[in-house]
Amino acid sequence: MALKEEIERIVHSAWPDPFEILGIHVIKWGGKEYVAVRAFLPDAADAAVVEVGSGREYPMKRLHKDGFFEAVIRGRTDVFQYRLKKTDQGNKTSLIIDPYSFLPILSDYDLYLIAEGTHYNQYDKLGAHEMTVDGVEGVFFAVWAPNAIRVSVTGDFNEWDGRRHMMRVRGSTGVWELFIPGLRQGVIYKYEVKSRYKGFLAEKADPYAFYSELRPKSASVVWNLDRYLWSDNRWMEARKETNWFESPMSIYEVHLGSWRRVPEEGGRWLTYRELADSLVPYVKDMGYTHVELMPVSEHPLDESWGYQTALYEYGDPLKGEQKDWGTLVFNYGRTEVANFLISNALFWLDKYHIDGLRVDAVASMLYLDYSRKPGEWTPNKFGGNENLEAVALIKRFNEIVHGRHPGVLTVAEESTAWPAVSRPTHLGGLGFSMKWNMGWMNDILRYFSDDPIFRKYHQNNLTFALLYAFTENFILVLSHDEVVYGKRSLLDKMPGDFWQKFANLRLLFSYMFAQPGKKLHFMGAEIGQWWEWNANSSLDWHLLQYEPHKKLQAFVKDLNDLYRSEPSMHEVDFTYEGFEWIDFSDYGRSIVSFIRKAKNPADFLVFVFNFTPVRRYNYRIGVPKGGFYREVLNSDSGLYWGSNTGNQGGRNADAIPWHRRPCSLNLDLPPLGALVFKPA
């Protein structure tokens, strides 16, 4: 018979493995063996055990007023299948399948891999999964909670009572599991976790949940992602063979909650179905090649943009807190946490067929003293400031992603001079495919924010990035970070009057697309947002009724089209062979010119930029050969709300040596304008 201490610990939910007490057991009593079935049914007035097949009933005795029942079956020593017959306070009877009648589900091999930190498909094992066990349909729950003394599954199905569905811990792994019969997709649940720390009790969302409630609610939802049937095999195979380093990449960065809203319905967000029908056609029409979605996992604070998550952080505040952002830091050095993070990355690739992943704030991971004062951080074992655990995690993440999913990109937002971020790990790099060029972004925005009269003193801000442009596989970015927190929108950063602001912005975009490196625009830049980005409201699409904004949008579309169609603008982004200065030394007039070349050097474009509002007539630049040079883009065209200063569609090269080249073009340069020429 059950001991009083055991009963009390079940009733007060203080037993780490309830299967040791609850369910069916062969017991010894008085020197003889019997079968005992025990159940904790807080809402039952009476209970009985019903044998499957024979239908034979065995009454259960209440051993505790809170609902602990036991049936000791004399004359039987066999473990048999049964159901629990429960009679509630209203005398209503129901037949239930005992969740404590099932054997463990996670295999020893699964547990070994989880403990080792190499179970990279954890999302198929941990979390909530519909399954059939011994012919019984239900949901299997599993979670890693190493510092818990008890974990329970709670939900509407048990009135959020953490005593009813206590989970079993699997040895010393810290993994808790339970199969609950009768549950199915759509069930709302949480884990109730009792901590070793003073018995602290907390409700937690499932870190492996496939679906979550909308804030302010925070429960997880059982969902079966495998019900969706993919039809993209052709793309998935083609992706493996795609050389993204030589392909056009013009990325449109999107925050789905504020790209567009429905004002007629209280400013609600668009659904994913609505986004598929509106965002995808828009991006394709604008000529962008990729979309970068800011974090899409459900999050309780809209203003966090989806970055602020919790769980599995360092216990040491010298490692586990990022004070600048008020966020906690994952415990990179623990194998199970590193496994969780890598498995999470693979989840998006496996279940959602995502084509790339960007890792945010990599610098804060790499450096132990990142934004910390002396005394606020602990050196590594060599006395340095490098976070060796984070470095190891990043390298392993990249190796596994690239190994399992050829053709998938990994991108680092890394703001320091850490070397070889986008170089393979076997060459000593971190293994990312590409890296955001934060230095270029800072320099270029500082330059464009200057009044043109002072730009001649700061031309190095335009040209300095070319000194290190080929040390990494860079993406040139104008991201969300530059249009928030008082930094102003891109258009509002531009100096000058109304016309000059638009001219400067077109010039900025032109210079960006002409430089080596892939490209990224944050949403709203293409229509000339006046206000900073606000995650709680839509972009100002109404601006497109005004000519300057509509024509700016048309310019970005044409710029994207040119970028995609001209190999010289994207084939050789990461080596010096694709770029050649014509002249960067005309500081006095703030003019620069250069050549971009394709893999075939004979395929090239000539770029000329005038960064002042002064028209320059008869301005000569050297070119590699004679013939006619067609003007394929003019940012000052009347089509884009410019002054329409140009070169009548192109110019013939003169046999006049200039800039150490055999021929030259005599050009009229528009104010705050960019010109692009292609030889016939």
What does each of the following model-derived ranges do?
Residues M1-P248, Y272-V283, G287, F498-F502, ...:
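Carbohydrate-interacting/catalytic domains
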Residues A47, V151, V291-L293, L357, ...:
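Hydrophobic residues within beta-strands of alpha/beta enzymes
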Residues Y197, S258-R260, S297-P300, A363-M365, ...:
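Feature marks short, surface-exposed loop/turn motifs that line or immediately flank catalytic pockets
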Residues A209-L214, R227-Y228, N233-I251, H255-E386, ...:
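Substrate-binding/active-site clefts of carbohydrate-active enzymes
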Residues R215-P216, H353-D355, Y370-N536, R564-I621, ...:
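Conserved alpha/beta catalytic core and glycan-binding cleft of carbohydrate-active enzymes
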Residues W269, T335, N339-I342, G356, ...:
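Conserved structured core elements
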Residues S278-L279, V337-W348, L393, F397, ...:
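Alpha-helical packing segments of well-folded alpha/beta enzyme cores
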Residues Y312, F330, N380, L490-M494, ...:
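Glycine- and acidic
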